[in-house]
Amino acid sequence: MKNLLSIFLITLLPGIANDAPGDNTPINHLQIIGSHNSYKRAIDPKLFKLLQKADSISMSKIDYEHISLSEQLGLGLRNLEIDVYADTAGGKYAHPKGLDMAPGQPAYDTEGLMNKPGFKVFHIQDIDYRTNCATFALCLQELKKWSEAHPNHSPVFITMNAKDEPMKRPGFTIPDKFTPAIYDKLDKEILDNLGPKHLITPDDVRGKYQTLEQAVLKNNWPTLKQARGRFIFLLDETAPKNLEYVKGHPSLKGRVLFINAEPGMPEAAICVLNNAKKQLSEITSLVKKGYIVRTRADSDTEEARTNDKSSFEAAMRSGAQLISTDYYKKSTHFKSDYVVSFPDGGYFRMDPVFSKKN
């Protein structure tokens, strides 16, 4: 009798039993919650208080922090964001100006990692420089270690910003510009520290098709089974920076990262439309065509401060596969009940656009 009852309930509740992603589900039919600026630690209170006096509005927008990348993955998040600054010679970011602005802060970079050449990971030079992994190589090594300890994990999307904008303040560090040669080093860093077997690249998705976009429109994304244990990197940048990455690599041939390319471009595969409420119908249209879309549940701490989930609700309805938040856990910086997860409390599910229930 119990077995019959179980079968009856399963039949009545397809959303629970029959609509979960299976191994043959293409990865563009998944919906995932992830984090924004996933490496970020809080600005030291002494410095934050000083900066807040000068510009309280801007500082409120960056008043958040995250647990380690491994801990986020352990919770079930499958989209992380890592920002990188090029530092070819090393030492460019070894002594942030903020250390001198507010004396008495905890020691910074005690291991001397910032003096070594290579990509550095933090939010804003000289101001918001505390991070859970100081170098890109360390971030990648942490991802690999976690992945190999959980070899059957669902695919993880890594969104990246290539940071090179100067601060409009005298004396602040001027970042190196990202050029095709610097991007070559970025690709090499990923390959050296993660290895091809842990990656899904544009070449993998393009397959036999002439362009990446043609493959995407023919639903040539790998299945969940094929994507397990792997990472997909996305360069979320402006058109000029994206074009620098594409130079010499039409349709991203031989490149490691996907880019935020406009539909109609040979490189189009993953699109970034961050305003889920205003762009809901556009997002849904792109998702139905085969593109993967990243959007945001919240930004600048605004939704969390007012406990406003309307953007998150729009993001879920839109079918955007990647939904970014700063609040997979409640804020510890201000009082709020705002927290983002799917109705079942998880961060991974079948995309409602492709759900059997729809």
Predicted regions and their residues:
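Catalytic cores of phosphodiester-bond hydrolases, prominently lipid phosphodiesterases
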Residues: 19-358
